[in-house]
Amino acid sequence: MALLSVSCREATPARAPETPKPELFLLTALPLVWSEDFGLDQPGSPALKALEQVYRVTAIDLPSQLPDGALLLAAQPRALPAEELVELDSWVRKGGRLLLLADPMLEWKSNIPLGDTRRPPMAFADTGLLERWGLRLDAPEERGARDGAVSERSVLTASPGALVATGDGCNVRDAGLTARCRLGKGEAIIIADADFLNVGSDKRGEQNLAVLASQLASLTR
């Protein structure tokens, strides 16, 4: 019996080591990682849960914290000081990969009073970054939900903006909802909406998160 037991243990195949997840850095003012009251007992958002299935997500406060060549999701970030905008531009041009959600009319509901710095910015604070990349972000003429598409994937947005090319570095797509920019050795995708991350667990939520996943994946190919 002892010999049989040893033989069975030796025949058990060794478990292959798990492949480590790639790292994704997250820069955002949206309540994706923490709820608005910063309660530790509050679960992460559906968007964060979806990201963590694929990536090791690391939240940062400033672009200067990024390592070279990394992947960054910047989702409606707070206004950055000028030196950090320069840092972000330089980081991309040195090989960084950026998915920027720049919403000119955020509809995400918040209980934080207007003027409180904890509240997500109602409009993307563009202080020249998009202009430097050859883009203009226009606010919508009318507010409300919009059915759209990103790279032929259905997406439900809320009061999305429109991107307009003002130079040669970016290719505007999806009826102005997105743009893809080659910048030096790096690349940036801009989506003129951030509300599409404010989802539940229904089919439309799954579709929106599939758009997020596909755009991030396209930056790693």
Outline where the language-model segments fall:
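Short, surface-exposed patches at the edges or C-terminal ends of soluble domains, predominantly
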Residues: 2-221
